[in-house]
């Protein structure tokens, strides 16, 4: 029986820009996908019984995604050999498990010669965990329990992110956000503010919303480094700060100019230099053991015809 090979990636996140509960009871988050993630290479062939080998310890959701995808798309059973690599640590709020699920599902579909669109991948991910919305190549408002977008925007800002990664971790599956319900009116307002920000092409409003949500989240998951990062954000002239609402990582946000701006390349390079300088500053002032890195969120571009082109700059 012939082996068939599939290769795919899944984007990670720097936490979320916003996360909470709306007045209609839906849990939501505004995604912060980044250009770091997981990669899966797998080979499969028909077999008399299921066998999945090569999945690293602690990555059980990856195995579930691979097998569930194969069962859903083609039945099975299959023998599957997996090679997995990831830039994302577990328990930090970097979207590691969702990135694994995305990479595993897409690689399996690719090996089978089939495609899974974003909505189908989202539904599969939500059947395995309360997922991030990083299967969509953009900033969206997402219901991770139902696996469906709440808002898909016709514009979103792009950020250079200085990612601060403490050594501590959290069991993200154990965090209970039902206590956020009394604050639902505030979260309704934040989502409405983002709708207005999209209409006005106001990227700064996304950064401000992220900072407000980070501060509200201190009531539920205390991040001991938020105060420090807020002070450094003001000192360094960054546009905002965000956190992993169910993890430990934080981000300092630098709004990148639109690719359509005059002299866009020079302006974007200047912001990236500022972000790099901020990363060096944070490495100097933060205690040893807090890792500091750089990432970026997906770019938005509009074609000359005015249609949305989300594939112009892939995450990988």
Residue ranges of model-derived segments:
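Short beta-strand
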Residues: 240-244
């Amino acid at each position: 029986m012939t082996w068939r090979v599939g290769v795919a990636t899944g984007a990670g996140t720097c936490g979320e820009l916003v996360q909470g509960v709306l007045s209609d009871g839906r849990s939501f988050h505004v995604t912060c996908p980044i250009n770091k993630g997981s990669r899966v290479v797998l080979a499969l062939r028909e077999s008399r019984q299921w066998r999945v080998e090569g999945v690293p310890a602690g990555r059980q959701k990856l195995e579930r995604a691979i097998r569930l995808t194969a069962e859903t798309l083609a039945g099975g059973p299959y023998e599957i050999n997996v090679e997995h690599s990831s830039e994302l640590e577990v328990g930090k709020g970097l979207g590691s498990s969702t990135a694994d699920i995305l990479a595993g599902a897409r690689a399996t579909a690719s090996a089978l010669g089939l495609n899974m669109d974003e909505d189908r991948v989202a539904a599969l991910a939500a059947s395995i965990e309360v997922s991030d919305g990083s299967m969509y190549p953009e900033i969206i408002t997402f219901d991770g329990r139902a696996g469906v977008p709440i808002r898909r925007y016709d514009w979103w800002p792009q950020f250079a992110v200085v990612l601060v990664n403490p050594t501590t971790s959290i069991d993200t599956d154990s965090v209970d956000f039902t206590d956020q319900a009394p604050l639902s009116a505030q979260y309704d307002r934040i989502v409405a503010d983002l709708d207005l920000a999209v209409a006005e092409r106001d990227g700064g409003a996304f950064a401000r919303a992220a900072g407000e949500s980070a501060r509200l989240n201190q009531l539920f998951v205390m991040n001991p480094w938020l105060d420090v990062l807020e002070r450094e954000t003001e000192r360094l002239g960054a546009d905002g700060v965000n956190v992993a609402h169910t993890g430990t990582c934080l981000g300092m946000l630098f709004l990148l100019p639109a690719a359509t701006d005059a002299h866009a390349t020079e302006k974007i390079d200047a912001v990236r230099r500022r972000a790099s300088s901020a990363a060096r500053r944070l490495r100097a002032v933060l205690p040893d053991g807090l890792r500091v890195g750089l990432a970026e969120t997906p770019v938005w571009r509009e074609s000359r015809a005015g249609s949305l082109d989300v594939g112009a700059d892939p995450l990988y």
